[in-house]
Amino acid sequence: MKTTTCSLLICISLLQLMVPVNTDETIEIIVENKVKELLANPANYPSTVTKTLSCTSVKTMNRWASCPAGMTATGCACGFACGSWEIQSGDTCNCLCLLVDWTTARCCQLS
């Protein structure tokens, strides 16, 4: 009796797994449909981003290069093949090698 009951429960469980599931509303399908809708009608969904990124380079003939006011240093380059540098205070490049003949700071600003 116990074996029959156990077998019956296993069969019922397996049958439930075999029942087709409605996959029309999975999160993947919903996202895919929304992306297609946005791409098909770009005029209906204007961009909320109105800022532009402007960048410039500042080169000095020493170990330090500072960005103009309001700009942030995003990267540095150093002369004499020095690959060791750091950004200090968010707007100044400092080359860390002993011998450096120039420093360039890449400065950017969102406006």
UniProtKB/Swiss-Prot annotation:
Signal peptide: 1-23
Keyword Isomerase annotated: no
Keywords of this entry: Disulfide bond, Hormone, Secreted, Signal
Annotated disulfide bonds: 55-108, 67-107, 76-93, 78-95, 82-97
CDD domains named among the record's database cross-references: RELM
Gene Ontology terms describing biological process: response to nematode; response to selenium ion
SUPFAM superfamilies: Resistin
Record InterPro entries: RELM (IPR009714), Resistin-like_sf (IPR036262)
Annotated coiled-coil segments of the chain: none
Entry-linked Pfam families: Resistin
Annotated tissue distribution: Highest levels in adipose tissue.
Subcellular location(s) of the protein: Secreted
GO cellular component: extracellular region
Alphabetized GO MF terms: hormone activity
Main location (coarse class): secreted
Family, similarity comment: Belongs to the resistin/FIZZ family.
Subunit comment: Monomer.
Role description: Probable hormone. Plays a role in pulmonary vascular remodeling.
Protein name: Resistin-like alpha
Species this protein is from: Mus musculus
Organism classification: Eukaryota, Metazoa, Chordata, Craniata, Vertebrata
Gene: Retnla
